């Protein structure tokens, strides 16, 4: 360390000790490219990467794949806030399907829209519903107003339907 140090010759012992301690950092292999990539960042650093990408909602209980998807979509959401695409990117990483119906597609007042959110087998909690409303309000266009938020669930199974048509005349035959 004495040959390669960048400190001046009159440095204090504290400065020399600090330089030696900081020199150990150079031996740590850290690829900045991997740290700033949501797909390759170590799982224990994902909360800090989410903070750096300004993720609007974060939950430690999410599976790792959901956390990575939310971080990956954060840039798109911030670039496209105020669009239907941003609303989709906010809701879909949480595992819900979304269908948007805008005012010109039906007879609703101008400047309004409705959302149909399809939940999976897990359902939806009251806290998640409130959080979803907050996220949608943050991502929706400022000139649009949400007038309907429907939560739906598809139930797979078989449905048998049948029909019968009966047509005929009543004929009465009298003797004679």
Curated annotation (Swiss-Prot):
Keywords: Late protein, Viral baseplate protein, Viral release from host cell, Viral tail assembly, Viral tail protein, Virion. Induction: Expressed in the late phase of the viral replicative cycle. It comes from Escherichia phage P2. It is found in: Virion. One of its GO terms (biological process) is viral tail assembly. GO terms for cellular component: virus tail, baseplate. Belongs to the P2likevirus gpI protein family. InterPro entries: Tail_protein_I (IPR006521). This is Baseplate protein I. Signal peptide: none annotated. Baseplate protein that may be part of the wedges of the baseplate. Plays a role in tail assembly. It comes from the Viruses.
